[in-house]
Regions:
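Conserved, structured core segments of small domains
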Residues: 1-118
């Protein structure tokens, strides 16, 4: 079994769609996420994951300069992640197929976790 990170990215379009949602629409969207993640967990493939707030800090360079970030000007904003344990990358991609982020023009990046203890 291999671990993969499913990295969720909101585009400016998807971020605007979230901002325009009524509380009822937001709850319906949250229910879709919970259903999708619950399905992955029910298969025993969920390792963990979280949603991320839109603001944070960025530390850059050898002087480790701290600035506000991520930047609003960016085309994509990392909005959350899941870590899954599956047989191969194709299975990780298949799990991402039902992600609700696609409904609002967001994307999922599937990345293998690097094993460092081998």
């Amino acid at each position: 079994m291999e671990k993969y990170l499913l990295l969720f990215r909101n585009s400016t379009v998807s971020e605007e769609a979230y901002q325009a949602m009524s509380p009822e629409e937001m709850q319906a969207n949250l229910d879709l996420w919970n259903q999708w993640i619950g399905g992955i967990a029910a298969q025993g493939k969920l390792v963990g994951g979280e949603a991320l707030k839109n603001s944070g800090k960025v530390i850059n360079g050898s002087k480790q300069v701290v600035t506000d970030g991520p930047y609003v000007e960016s085309k994509e904003l990392v909005s959350g992640f899941l870590m899954v344990q599956v047989d191969n990358q194709e299975e990780a991609i298949a799990l991402s197929a039902g992600c609700p982020i696609y409904d609002i023009e967001g994307s999922v990046e599937v990345r293998p976790i690097m094993l460092t203890n081998q």
